[in-house]
């Protein structure tokens, strides 16, 4: 197989781009590094295309390795023909390769293998030849043998039929046809095991739809219902059509002796051997496709969450709500340093609201708090009402935000949190995390397993290795897009930087603690286990503010410093200007990028990136994102009326719509049909996590705590 050719066709890019990207990957370069600093080499392939290329490259190489193993196995058996070898070499999927290998795969004892041991294969061959005119019993009588364990003609015929059934089931062409027909025309059918059972799966108690039309979230729901033993799920294939096909392929001539036998063999082969295997395969394919879709959604949601803009320069009060154990508060300064922690008891059973307000007033006056970050877990609703009341009673201008606290409890009980705050209990740590994830979501959320962040669907039912790998890639891409401050970044953040492992990340922090702040990027080479290759991969993503070299505070890679300094010299700008806010207007002095790039001996795309960076050093891509909605008052669900227009934040995007926080504690659902006037295939075409949107209330169900919303505001 021409792997490079396949990748070129699949990705819709040039062969030269694929060749270059594969070479760079094989040389140990990371995806963020290739996407950012090797644009000329790859023709500016972005990180998304490079990730797809890398994933497919691994699959196709794995496929080639499997082909090599299979060809060697069949050759060892002395059964490899030129035609079979060609078919295996040209197969494009693992399923096709395994189909071709099936007849030669070492088997456990089967009815067919036992029949062969009893010497019945020649009888099977005679039946399949379809030439005999002798009655079947007469033919079979020749194979009756006490020694071989064939007691009578019927046993001989049954054994021959078993051999033929297995042989038919192993023909790759038949399996491919049946698989395709099952996928295209088959249905997935579910039923409830006990009609009296009440569950969230009621819509699937008597459900049937075409396999090819079953949406990913429904596949995952059916799988979960089956796993929880509430539903039975099966694939109903067009059996009559399949049997007609097999009869046509196997029965090549009408023979009154062999035709009835072969018809029985075909039915048995399909029902006993082929159908269960194809059903498993189709279910697995459906699940894989559904999981891939869910992982993509999870990844997009996670990216939006991580790339939320930081709220800088404000002292924040983190509020971890609770009932019996009290609400834990943590005051965090503008740099994320913890100034104070307190526990108050304004909620049931103690209801010490006035005491809580006095404590809040003291904290706000003492630390000049202007923003309260409230976790959205247990007792959040009650806490929000108290905060809104309190804000009205004080002269200071204070706002609050409801923050998704998913994962905060996981973090607060982790080894990492214990190391960071050894003297704090889990509640205090959680309050700190809730405050910090508002100040700098990326820096705080990288401390939490992405699976615990709560922006996916059915994540616990998926292939955990695949999920972790995909989400890890998302975090890596986000961290490298933003970059880190080498002197303040935690080990949790550093480990996602291109070329940096967990061990090296910890070594960087240790070096910092032992030697003080880094003053230039070259000092990274003094860090234990950080060699020249790791330095090449990581240096551009690590910034040093106020260091020896102003370029170290930018995302210009050290390999391009010579070109950057020459560019500044030609523009008559001192390097020190970079540290003061950038070399404004430098792009206006360039008339011919191509010519200049040749003179400076850098690529044209790299030159453009250098210019952008010199004009606005260490620009943060998160600044372009929408900031969270800050509130001073609270709404109650019972206050909502159909037709009301509200502003909200998209909290989660799933296959069938988006959940929006409108400030009433219960997120409302905007169904996919209400996201846009135009037809969209998926909600992500209209919204992303973190988007600030205007919505109209369609309906409120107080009993079920459901709010229906629409983003189609005007009537046509």
Label for each model-derived stretch:
Residues 49-52, 59, 63, 68-318, ...:
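Duplex nucleic acid-engaging cores and interfaces of nucleic-acid transaction enzymes
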Residues 281-299, 452-483, 597-642:
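Long, charged amphipathic helices and adjacent flexible linkers at domain junctions
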Residues 139-153, 207, 245-270, 274, ...:
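Low-complexity, acidic/Ser/Thr- and charged residue-rich accessory regions of DNA metabolism proteins
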Residues 180-188, 319-323, 377-379, 403-410, ...:
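A glycine-rich phosphate-binding loop feature that marks nucleotide/adenosyl-phosphate handling sites
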Residues 96, 401, 407, 412-482, ...:
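Long, charge-rich intrinsically disordered scaffolds of nucleic-acid metabolism proteins
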Residues 37-39, 128, 238, 321, ...:
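Short, ordered loop/turn segments at secondary-structure junctions
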Residues 30-31, 42, 46-147, 481-624, ...:
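Accessory alpha-helical DNA-binding modules that contact the DNA backbone or grooves
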